[in-house]
Amino acid sequence: MKIPAQLALITALAASTLSSHADWPQWRGPHRTAVVKDPAHPFTKINADPKNLWQIDVGPGQSSPIIAGDAAVYMDGINGQEVIHVLDLKTGKERWKAQVGPMVEFQNAYGEGPRCTPLVDEDRVYAQSCGGEFRCYSLKDGKQLWAISFEKDFGAKWFGNKNPDPGSKETASRRHGNNGSAAIDGDRIFVPVGSPENGTLIAFNKLTGAKLWAAGSDNTAYSSVVVGTLAGVRQAVHLTGDAMMGVNVATGEILWREIVKTGAKRNVATPVLDGDTVTIASTSIGTIRYRISGKAPEQTIAKAWENKEMKTVIGTPTQSGNLIFTIGPGNKCDLVCLGAEDGTERWKTPGMGDYASITVINDKVFALNSNGELVVAQADGSAFKETGRLQLCAKTWASPAYDNGRFLVKDGSKLTLLTLD
């Protein structure tokens, strides 16, 4: 049936309005870009003494918190289990909690507990454990609606801290956990299952859990799935342990694939989509932008630019307009501004520790480093222009959620809702 142009425009505007809601319902916010506009809160002055609206004790884990409507959602570790919690956003009072899967013991600096950020879509919340247990719950009361196991259902072998083969120099791409977040588009949810035999990326009906298609034969790494339209084709883009691929959301056909070799298969950053381009970063290859062209069923990927010096260990770049804000390289990272059109460095400033989550709100860059220090600067390519700096929390690798002037911040022992203006 042909839709009248006026109706199509109204539908598009309605979808745009819904998607621009101020909530932070998933990893990196409403559009998975870590960029939002909130004219009501220009942050012209940053309060050096933030106001805590509430604060609660939490268990271990580096999973980031999210905000959906009047609910705050987070995951932590309790008594050997990874647990999802839903709270009243206004008061911090718990509404319900549920066990997602057994905790995994890790031998690294990031500690134990969940590492994947939950996802809210309408009246449902989706959670994933490090060990690959994936659950869909009712956001209202915590009733489990459907579930899958990466290993039991799809044969995605869990290596933990071990190498996949005795004596092998290769390391398991998921040895630090199944950390990449799923993504939703329409009635489909795209889950990074990571089974070489049964699908790297698998699409399910988001309401029933019915499998729709499976694509790829790579192990997953730690990168989250992102959905967008590239060269006119709606696709799920996924950075695996070995490559990056674009998958047709409707059919599961792989539209393009590019080998991305990094040490220990450590592909962590979420791909950044901009028009027909995809930007990725890693500790081995630096930062690279690719351009996608052509039509389905087979598209072409070509390198637009690369900055080999801009190596990022576990951070994801954030693009705002024609600027990219990122971190790297090394364990004492700089905050860096790149030009999106050519990848050249515009400016850099030290002091980010070994990680920083970067959020852009209006014309301000908010960089929360691993030591819990928040650095605020103008989103300006001419020079680093700091507008605020304060200690926000203890050591953390979790990204904050933002909603209507409020920040939801999680470290290793506290979850805090606070304001800065």
Give the role of each language-model region:
Residues 1-3:
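N-terminal secretory signal peptides that target proteins for export/translocation
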Residues 6-16:
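Bacterial N-terminal signal peptides
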Residues 20-421:
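Noncatalytic, solvent-exposed loop/strand surfaces
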